[in-house]
Swiss-Prot record:
GO terms for molecular function: ATP binding; guanylate kinase activity. It comes from the Bacteria. Essential for recycling GMP and indirectly, cGMP. Its EC number is 2.7.4.8. This is Guanylate kinase. InterPro entries: GK/Ca_channel_bsu (IPR008145), Guanylate_kin-like_dom (IPR008144), Guanylate_kinase (IPR017665), Guanylate_kinase_CS (IPR020590), P-loop_NTPase (IPR027417). Keywords: ATP-binding, Cytoplasm, Kinase, Nucleotide-binding, Transferase. Residues 7-185 form the Guanylate kinase-like domain. ATP binds at G14, P15, S16, G17, A18, G19, K20, G21. It catalyses: GMP + ATP = GDP + ADP. Belongs to the guanylate kinase family.
Length: 206
């Protein structure tokens, strides 16, 4: 008889421009069984972003109503916009034994860690601060003032690396994805995640 295991919660975050979204997209393409949680936000869509696929784009009024209804696992205000993780999708999939990936900001990740200390928390770092600035500028979606604001915030966010279980440098997307896949495999083999399994095997041998 197989033992049903709780799904693994994988939280991926890092400063703006570190490449979290690109990494998560490539990870999901390689690991078809992973469930990517879609965040809600009040910011405007960037070029090519689709509502319900990249984000659930909400008005500030809609977002605040969701807060009142306790619909979020976590939420935070970042760069003058609200971001949040809808609760129902995450909890349902974890309970069903599915592994769930959250791509969220650092504020949100730390809130999730308080509720799910057993989760796997991965911090994505750029290869250098110069490269980070170039990536933010290349997006072409922010004014010079916003770029400076994001860059300063990113520098401060590096102080939170020690709150995470793992750090992955995104100097190459494929290499970063392979490191995250290795982390997931290792986490699934941890003794404290397999107690029921080895106890069952031990009982069968008695």
């Amino acid at each position: 008889m197989s033992i049903k295991k709780q799904g693994l919660l994988i939280v991926i975050s890092g400063p703006s421009g570190a490449g979290k979204g690109t990494i998560c997209k490539a990870l999901i393409e390689k690991e078809k069984d992973l469930k990517l949680s879609i965040s809600a936000t009040t910011r405007q869509p960037r070029a090519g972003e689709v509502d319900g696929k990249n984000y659930f784009f909400k008005s500030e009024e809609e977002f605040k109503r969701m807060i009142e209804e306790d619909a979020f696992l976590e939420w935070a205000k970042v760069y003058d916009h609200y971001y949040g993780t809808p609760k129902e999708f995450v909890l349902k999939n974890l309970e069903e034994g599915n592994d769930v990936v959250l791509e969220i900001d650092i504020q949100g990740a730390l809130k999730v860690k308080e509720k799910f200390p057993e989760g796997v928390f991965i911090f994505i770092l750029p290869p250098s601060m110069e490269e980070l600035r170039n990536r933010i500028k290349k997006r072409g979606t922010e004014s010079e003032e916003e770029i400076i604001k994001r860059f300063k915030s990113a520098y401060e966010e590096l102080n939170y690396v020690s709150k995470y279980n793992y750090v992955v440098i995104n100097d190459d997307v494929d290499r970063a994805v392979e490191k995250i896949r290795a982390i997931i495999i290792a986490e699934k083999c941890r003794v404290d995640r397999n107690k029921d399994l080895y106890l069952k095997i031990r009982e069968e041998s008695v």
